[in-house]
Amino acid sequence: MLCVPVFIILFIIIPFAPTSESQPKTKEEVAKASVHDNAERTLQRLWNQSHCCPIDLQCCPPG
């Protein structure tokens, strides 16, 4: 009787297993990921620059 909750949890978790992540990506998927990473990096840099200290410029990241 104690095994029933374990089996229920396993049946819930199994469909979310990362099987698609283990497959190799196509060139198109890699290009999309690269563009997304570049955009994310640019947004992060702009966010960091917009929150600089106006008085003490040493707290601002270079670039």
Swiss-Prot record:
It is found in: Secreted. InterPro entries: T-conotoxin. Residues 23-50 form a propeptide. GO terms for cellular component: extracellular region. Residues 1-22 form the signal peptide. The modification Proline amide is found at P62. Keywords: Amidation, Disulfide bond, Secreted, Signal, Toxin. One of its GO terms (molecular function) is toxin activity. Expressed by the venom duct. Its main location: secreted. The keyword Transmembrane helix does not apply. The keyword Ubl conjugation does not apply. Contains 2 disulfide bonds that can be either 'C1-C3, C2-C4' or 'C1-C4, C2-C3', since these disulfide connectivities have been observed for conotoxins with cysteine framework V (for examples, see AC P0DQQ7 and AC P81755). The cysteine framework is V (CC-CC). Belongs to the conotoxin T superfamily. This is Conotoxin Vi5.1b. It comes from Conus virgo (Virgin cone).
